[in-house]
């Protein structure tokens, strides 16, 4: 089940597990133009994803200062169960298409690792920059 995390306490409890951007504060992740979702199975959280809405595709984390409307940026995702990361990306994209009809593009701000690149390309992504 997909759940939007809306309180600072909910997000703070999970931020410490973020393998890519643990330095981003919980309050930054849920302020205007940003959302955090958890995927649950039997009340256990199996994956987490953080989304920022922008007007253009960011080239780096620094480019995500000001929120926008047209681009959903999945800037960090982590999972506690094999396959749950892919599942949460697909479910959140589907949810955003229904709720944020103005979003025209979905991108990830993934770290430059071979594993991340293979994962995204295998799942239909287009590499925009290296």
Describe the function of each predicted region.
Residues 59-125:
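Acyl-donor binding region in acyl/amide transferases
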Residues 1-70, 77-78, 101-107:
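Non-catalytic substrate-recognition and accessory regions of acyl/acetyltransferase enzymes
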Residues 126-130:
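Conserved catalytic-core motifs of GNAT/GCN5-like acyltransferases
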């Amino acid at each position: 089940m997909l759940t939007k995390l809306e309180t600072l306490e909910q997000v703070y409890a999970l931020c410490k597990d973020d393998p890519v951007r643990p330095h981003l504060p919980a309050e930054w992740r849920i302020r205007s133009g940003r959302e955090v979702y958890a995927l649950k199975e039997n009340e256990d959280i199996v994956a987490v994803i953080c989304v920022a809405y922008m007007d253009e595709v960011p080239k780096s984390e620094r480019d995500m200062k000001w929120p926008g409307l047209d681009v959903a940026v999945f800037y960090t995702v982590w999972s506690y169960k094999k396959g749950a990361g892919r599942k949460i990306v697909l479910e959140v994209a589907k949810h955003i298409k229904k709720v944020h009809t103005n979003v025209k593009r979905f991108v990830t701000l993934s770290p430059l690792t071979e594993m991340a690149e293979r994962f995204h390309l295998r799942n239909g992504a287009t590499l925009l920059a290296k």
